[in-house]
Amino acid sequence: MNYLVLKQRIYLVISVLTLIVLGSGYGSCTKFSDRLSDSAMVALDSFHHCQYMALSRGIGYAGRRSEQLDYADQLSRHTTVEQLVEIANTDTSRIARLWAYRILLKKADKQVFDVLKQALKDTTHVELESGCIGSEEPYNRAAIFVYNYDGNELKLSNQLRFSLDSLIFFGYMKNKGFENGLLMDFKPHKIYYATVIEEADKGNDAILPLLAQYKNPNDRQRINKLLKANLKKAGVCSYEACDAISNWNDPAFEWYAKAACQATIKQEDYDAWDILHLLCAYPAPWSYQILKKLLTQKGDYSNSDTAKDYLRERYKTRPVPPIFKPLYDRYVARKK
């Protein structure tokens, strides 16, 4: 064969292959947007104009209605699961990505596990709004907040929920040394226990709520050590300790409840909500006296109403402890 002819044929083959590669690349770039319906594109474009993700429908002190849930409903109805996965993983708007991920959670699709796994690698900041509260969070933590926010409403299989929880526990929180606390409520699975003990023995009081859930008598000394250090550090009742005792009101921890509550009410400004869990966990003369002080407090912004509302709600489904009964009958039951 003539060398020139052979050379021309080689160039022709290379040219054809190049066109095929470029063509397929172009196809992959346009394929996704071409697949989306007009309704889905409108919803997606709406998210692209959002500066924050609205977790709740009402936003701000005035409860201004956010339309983001409407956009989400439209996106959910006009996309497939595969399209939502692609949006959640690749969209240029992190607000749109979070919403696609949230929709996947509500659909309880197992592909949400891989979406969350990828999200945990992203530290770009994004703004979240819920009611009157707003915060700017790294994307990975925002993804955890979205999951936790909808938590009880999600119709996830036990296996999928456990997989997501474990991914967050080991893939984010353990890697971070639990520096931001637990961020969500974990069930006391055996698989977490060794890590929980390891963190507790390091003196990490952020782990207290989960450690208490195991209700292991062998952990009493370990928990008391953490409570003692926590009280010394905080000086008053802390969220971690309060949550731990709410999970396990063992008599061995009553000393903490008493000391923390007494220290808290000595503060010039405190919120009764912070100590009501502890007071009700240990019905005793000391807690009776503090509860009475709260219920009889005067002033426009007193803790009295907070205490009454808390007690009324708490004792809807359980008997009032005998020692609290006179206070309940006088200050709560008669005040409808």
Protein language model features and the residues they cover:
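Extended repeat-based scaffolds of very large eukaryotic assembly and lipid-transport proteins
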Residues: 29-243, 248-262, 269-273, 305, ...
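Bacterial Sec-dependent N-terminal signal peptides
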Residues: 1-36
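Alpha-helical structural elements of signaling/regulatory helical domains
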Residues: 188, 283-286
